[in-house]
Design a protein with these regions (language model features):
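Gly/Gly-Pro-rich "capping" loops immediately C-terminal to redox-active cysteine motifs
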Residues: 48-52, 282-294
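Alpha-solenoid HEAT/ARM repeat scaffold
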Residues: 98, 132-135, 165-166, 198, ...
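Structural signature of alpha-helical solenoid repeat scaffolds
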Residues: 105, 139-142, 172, 205, ...
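Electrostatic cytochrome c docking/interface patches
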Residues: 245-272
Length: 294
């Protein structure tokens, strides 16, 4: 149900000990911009905010391209006709589609809704990306705060589980516009794919107690993996007005005794606190593979 990442390579690296890449953004032409804070300090939890070494005035921005490949021709977005913007939703670049949806949110709602419906009706059903195009359309209708009910119902039954899961997430935020939200979530809770059921579990926590618990009960009729189990437990506790029981900490075997054991126990508690050692170095001490902390 969850995601697993595997390290392939370092996209950029430096021998400069002050190198601090803190943000990245893909430009409309496909190039990648990387913001380098470039500071002797690391992070903001290890050093005082008023540390004199904290530089507020300097930094670097790198632009990364592939020299032997042409850049993407930037799509027409700002001020473009609605018809052009809707066709942008078919482009492969995610950030282009994102910026297009942002632009459509600022247009006349009635005009966007009307032209969006016409655009959907003329999509090629044989297009391999057909369901994805429909999902983009659903996101547009959500963005203008006028969710397309027929479309959300259609996508909740899509062939691609990614699309079904995304439709459930839209349903989470637009229940005030979909009168049978609970009934639709009940169907999602029976979905064959865990990702869809996980979205249904999370969304159930937004409902009233009676409706939400029914959906949670339905979702747990199928196996819950580690990602779903935690969400299910938390949602159930929230709807029931209780707290998630704190897991008893596993007793660590050690040869230490007396003062050494007391010191070890206190150190372990500090290490495990959120925002302290454990956050970067991880419980096993092997650190986050891509964090740069050792």
């Amino acid at each position: 149900t969850g995601y697993k990442s595997n390290h392939r390579q370092d996209l950029i690296r430096s021998d400069d000990r002050n190198f601090r890449p803190v943000d990245l953004e893909f430009a409309p032409d496909g190039s990648l911009y990387i913001a380098d804070w470039h500071n002797i300090l690391i992070g903001h939890m290890q050093h005082n905010a008023r540390d004199p070494l904290r530089d507020h005035a300097h930094g670097r921005i790198y632009r990364v391209t592939y020299p032997s490949r042409p850049l993407v021709k930037p799509a027409d977005i700002a001020g473009a006709p609605i018809a052009v913007l809707l066709d942008n939703l078919k482009l492969p670049e995610y950030r282009t589609r994102y910026r297009t949806r942002r632009e459509l949110r600022g247009r006349n709602v009635s005009e966007v809704a009307s032209k969006l419906r016409n655009w959907v009706d003329h999509l090629d059903k044989n297009d391999p990306k057909f369901e994805h195009h429909l999902l983009e359309a659903l996101w547009v209708s959500w963005g203008i705060n006028k969710v397309d009910e027929p479309l959300i119902r259609q996508l909740l039954k899509a062939k691609d589980y990614h699309v079904r899961a995304a439709a459930v997430r839209v349903l989470r935020y637009t229940g005030h516009q979909v009168p049978d939200q609970a009934a639709l979530l009940m169907q999602a809770a029976k979905d064959e794919h865990g990702r869809v059921r996980l979205e249904a579990i999370v969304t159930a926590s937004w409902l009233d107690k009676e409706q939400g618990l029914k959906i949670l009960n339905e979702a747990e009729k199928l196996p819950l993996d580690e990602w779903m189990a935690n969400a299910h437990e938390t949602a159930e506790a929230h709807l029931s007005g209780t707290s998630v029981e704190e897991k008893k900490e596993e007793i660590v075997k050690t040869h230490l005794k007396g003062k050494d054991l007391d010191l070890y126990t206190k150190g372990k508690a500090i290490y495990s606190r959120e925002g302290y050692c454990n956050t970067c170095h991880q419980p096993d001490g092997k650190r986050l593979s891509a964090s740069g902390f050792s």
